[in-house]
Amino acid sequence: MPKLKTHRGAAKRFKVTGTGKIMRRRANKSHLLTGKPSKRTRHLRQIAQVDETQYKAIRMLIPYKF
């Protein structure tokens, strides 16, 4: 069986913790921030955990991070 290729875009966007959780950045934090309340932008700084329904798809994209 050939080697699996890592999806380079996914590799840059997702990090895997020591316990195997997949973490991601939150959306709506790249531009047009002046119209958003500071409370919202502050909460968008927090790293979020990927939902369990997406785990299988992301594991196929980044097979060697586990």
UniProtKB/Swiss-Prot annotation:
Q: What is this protein called?
A: Large ribosomal subunit protein bL35
Family according to the record: Belongs to the bacterial ribosomal protein bL35 family.
**Originating species:** Thermodesulfovibrio yellowstonii (strain ATCC 51303 / DSM 11347 / YP87)
List the InterPro entries.
Ribosomal_bL35, Ribosomal_bL35-like, Ribosomal_bL35_CS, Ribosomal_bL35_sf
Query: Upper lineage ranks?
Result: Bacteria, Pseudomonadati, Nitrospirota, Thermodesulfovibrionia, Thermodesulfovibrionales
Instruction: Give the NCBIfam families listed for this entry.
Output: rpmI_bact (TIGR00001)
Which molecular function terms from Gene Ontology are attached? structural constituent of ribosome
**Domain of life per record:** Bacteria
One GO cellular component this record assigns the protein to is:
cytosolic large ribosomal subunit
Q: What are the entry keywords?
A: Ribonucleoprotein, Ribosomal protein
